[in-house]
């Protein structure tokens, strides 16, 4: 069937992480969302304390990185799927390959 995979993050989460929602476009059934990526590595802010995420750059708000991943962007190249995302409160950009999406 026709399925939409929606990747997003939620301002206010602690830590803000990348979520995925699966929507069947034939029936408009929505599966529950699941966390697919959260800050673990040092460069993602993984060892920093938990804070409630807020809009905007953490450099402007806190003077440096925070424990947050946000703003996912999906793209395809050579039949491979990738996700770009901002990390550490918009202090950098991460890249991750996506495997097995939509597989049973």
Identify the residue ranges that each predicted region occupies:
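Carbohydrate-active catalytic/glycan-binding domains of CAZyme proteins
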Residues: 1-104
């Amino acid at each position: 069937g026709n399925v939409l995979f929606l990747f997003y993050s939620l301002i206010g989460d602690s830590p803000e992480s990348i979520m995925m929602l699966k929507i069947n476009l034939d029936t408009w059934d929505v599966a529950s969302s699941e966390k697919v990526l959260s800050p673990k590595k040092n460069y993602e802010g993984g060892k920093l304390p938990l804070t409630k995420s807020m809009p905007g750059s953490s450099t402007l708000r806190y003077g440096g990185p925070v424990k947050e991943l946000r703003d996912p962007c999906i793209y395809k190249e050579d039949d491979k799927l990738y996700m770009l995302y901002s990390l550490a409160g918009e202090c950098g950009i991460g890249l991750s390959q996506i495997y097995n999406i939509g597989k049973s």
